[in-house]
From Swiss-Prot:
Name this polypeptide is given: D-amino acid dehydrogenase
Lineage, highest ranks first: Bacteria, Pseudomonadati, Pseudomonadota, Gammaproteobacteria, Lysobacterales
Catalytic activity: a D-alpha-amino acid + A + H2O = a 2-oxocarboxylate + AH2 + NH4(+)
Enzyme Commission number, as recorded: 1.4.99.-
GO cellular component: cytoplasm; plasma membrane
UniProt-listed GO biological process terms: D-alanine catabolic process
Biological function: Oxidative deamination of D-amino acids.
Single GO molecular function: D-amino-acid dehydrogenase activity
Length: 435
């Protein structure tokens, strides 16, 4: 089977890897000069298998109003003329109830835990390295209210058998001694020992190289213009003015996926959630994080790679704008100076922004569509790196009509469709047309 994958970020590349292993002929196209150069380029570096949560959570609507007036708000909204922005925000607000939060988080945890297993197996098989650390992650609470609010998440962690530790300030120093140099005295923390860290871009590029050795063809500098449709089936895509035919197409274009799907009448509720990062050369390892910490107040993570510190986070709903906002840089600098002063060289920091493809409920969109031969792997929001290996392996099983290792409930786009169209997974959409 010939599979055309649109997009070579971490999601498209892991999809290519697993489809190649399943015996498919795989072609990957991307508009950039290499793999992982857009949203996957400089994300937070967290593999947050346990700390997987939707932005749509109880209390967020009231917090969002307060954040409108805060300089260092973790979530900000810049109104645009795009009506889709307001539709997406309204849908997100509907998912902020405790009941919907529990459902959405459980779906995300299911995929994240599967992704952890998939990444461990992939790493063992290939020996791939990506400046990774297996030392857990820590969520830091500045207030008792934040610590008390973690009870809801702890209940779900317990339900899924995910190990965790609630740390006192004294216990916190044992795992992250560098915090002692900071100006903040945290009231407590939640540690997830099975979480990891690593450079997403490095992983993506090295996995692309391994996939290429398996015969996967990567074509860069390619603009995807539209999908080719023949009745109920997608038969390929127009790329740089030429038709590239395939038995199956996978849309892994992140925030740009809805733009490609709209002409087919598919309204995918994925919208850009703009994030920011600052990568610093490390200048004092003793004052740097051991792994990753997340400051809950600002939704900013500080992550250690081999010789670099990555400070990343926040969410700005501002459409497809990729300009660098100096105010966001000041927030990143403020947090790292608060928490780990002197760990990195702020004067030589690389400031970056990326558009994270977010769904209103936080769960990605993976699987079939109403069109035969068209599959999606997008909408992972801030957790694309975390969920990438599991998403790629799960999608390969779907396309190749193999039994999936996790439940497909709530993962495909049909949870959004008010339609009588049956999910074509039931009729093996992966089977190529008869010649």
């Amino acid at each position: 089977m010939r599979v055309l994958i649109l997009g070579s970020g971490v999601i498209g590349t892991t999809s290519a890897w697993y489809l190649s292993k399943a015996g498919c002929e795989v072609v990957v196209v991307d508009r950039q000069s290499g793999a992982g150069l857009e949203t996957s380029y400089a994300n937070g570096g967290q593999l947050s298998f346990g700390y997987t949560s939707p932005w749509a959570a109880p209390g967020v609507p009231l917090k969002a109003v307060r954040w409108l007036f805060e300089r260092h708000a973790p979530l900000s909204i810049r109104p645009t003329t795009d009506w889709n922005q307001y539709v997406w925000l309204a849908r997100m607000l509907r998912h902020c109830s405790a009941e919907r939060y529990a459902v959405n988080k459980s779906r995300m945890l299911r995929l994240s835990e599967y992704s952890r297993e998939a990444l461990e197996a992939l790493s063992a098989e290939t020996g791939i390295t990506f400046e990774g650390r297996r030392l857990g992650t820590i969520q830091l609470f500045r207030t008792q209210q934040q610590l008390d609010g973690a009870v809801r998440d702890i209940e779900l962690l317990t339900q899924y058998g995910i190990p965790y530790e609630v740390l006192s300030p004294h216990q916190l120093a044992k795992f992250e001694p560098g915090l002692a140099d900071g100006s903040v005295r945290f009231v407590g923390a939640l540690r997830l020992p099975h979480d990891q860290t690593g450079d997403c871009c490095l992983f993506t590029q090295r996995l692309a190289a391994l996939a290429a050795k398996r015969g996967v063809e990567f074509r860069y500098g390619c603009t995807v213009q539209r999908l080719e449709v023949d009745g109920p089936r997608v038969t390929g895509a127009w790329i740089n003015g030429a038709l590239e035919r395939a038995d199956c197409c996978v849309v892994a274009l992140g925030s740009y996926s809805p733009l490609l799907l709209a002409p087919l009448g598919l309204r995918l509720p994925v919208y850009p959630l703009k994030g920011f990062s600052l990568t610093l050369p490390m200048i004092d390892a003793s004052r740097a994080p051991v792994s990753t910490v997340l400051d809950e107040s600002y939704k900013v993570a500080v992550t250690r790679f081999d010789e670099r510190i990555r400070v990343a986070g926040m969410a700005e709903v501002s459409g497809y704008d990729v300009s660098l906002n100096p105010r966001r840089r000041s927030t990143l600098e403020m947090v790292v100076q608060d928490v780990y002063p002197g760990c990195g060289d702020l004067g030589r920091g690389e400031f970056w922004t990326g558009l994270r493809p977010a769904t209103p409920d936080g769960t990605p969109v993976i699987g079939a569509t109403p069109y035969q031969g068209l599959f999606l792997n997008t909408g992972h929001g801030t957790l694309g790196w975390t969920m990438s290996s599991g998403s790629g392996r799960y999608l390969a099983d779907l396309i190749c009509c193999r039994p999936c290792e996790i439940s497909s409930e709530g993962l495909d786009m049909f949870r959004y469709l008010v339609s009588t169209i049956p999910c074509p997974q039931e009729c093996a959409p992966c089977v190529p047309p008869t010649p």
